[in-house]
């Protein structure tokens, strides 16, 4: 690991430590089997990705960050927060299907952090870019925002029933006592397609 990479990894670790309490406050603690073991840099990759490399501990993961995340402070914060939120309910399966609920939650976390650090203007430009480039993520965020407006504790309640959020079912919504429009619930539980 080069000196430059060591500095970047140290910055990532500081960001993660600083934001973990806020992420857990919003969405609950990580699933009991989840284990984060550090960051690594990849100058070639286009986006952050979780790496599952330990067969004896399938939910143990590293976060591999692209060098391009460091080109912009807003993007860096968004990328780190998104991977931190995913890390609450890591998905090691190769053929894993995420849901609108999961992807919207991930974006929601990033938006909250951007708003706190950089303000409303940065949130607007981030959401506009999302709407133009990857509308499926924008839509997922919108539905999760509806859910959390109705019940700010909804994700925490759901994850108390099913810690791995991508496995949440309609029955879990009922068990968690979450009152939400049926159509919104159905959309949240759909398989996510970007």
Q: Which residues are covered by each model-predicted region?
A:
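Post-HExxH zinc-binding segment in Zn-dependent metallohydrolases
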Residues: 98-135
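Active-site recognition of the HExxH zinc-binding catalytic motif
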Residues: 74-94, 103, 107, 111
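Auxiliary, metal-adjacent structural segments of Zn-dependent hydrolase domains
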Residues: 1-70
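A short glycine/serine-rich beta->alpha loop
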Residues: 69, 91-98
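Pan-zinc metallopeptidase signature
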Residues: 138-194
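Soluble non-cytosolic domains of exported or imported proteins
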Residues: 10-14, 71, 75, 79, ...
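Extracytoplasmic/secreted proteins, especially bacterial periplasmic and envelope-associated proteins
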Residues: 18, 79, 101, 105-109, ...
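Sec-exported extracytoplasmic/periplasmic mature domains
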Residues: 24, 28, 89, 110-118, ...
């Amino acid at each position: 690991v080069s000196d430059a990479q060591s500095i970047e990894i140290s910055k990532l670790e500081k960001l993660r430590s600083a934001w973990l309490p806020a992420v857990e406050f919003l969405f609950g603690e990580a699933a009991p089997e989840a284990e984060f073991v550090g960051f690594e840099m990849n100058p070639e990759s286009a986006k952050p990705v979780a790496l599952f490399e330990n067969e004896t501990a399938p939910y143990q993961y590293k976060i591999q960050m692209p060098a391009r995340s460091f080109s912009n402070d807003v993007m860096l914060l968004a990328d780190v927060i998104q991977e931190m939120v995913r890390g609450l309910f890591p998905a090691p399966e190769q053929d894993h299907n995420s849901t609108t609920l999961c992807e919207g939650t991930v974006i929601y976390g990033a938006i909250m952090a951007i708003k706190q650090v950089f303000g409303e203007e940065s949130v607007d430009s981030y959401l506009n870019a999302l709407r133009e480039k990857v509308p499926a993520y924008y839509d997922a965020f919108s539905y999760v925002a509806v859910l959390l407006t109705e019940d700010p504790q909804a994700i925490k309640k759901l994850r108390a029933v099913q810690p791995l959020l991508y496995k949440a079912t309609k029955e879990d919504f009922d068990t968690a006592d979450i009152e939400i429009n049926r159509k919104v619930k159905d959309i949240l539980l759909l398989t996510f397609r970007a």
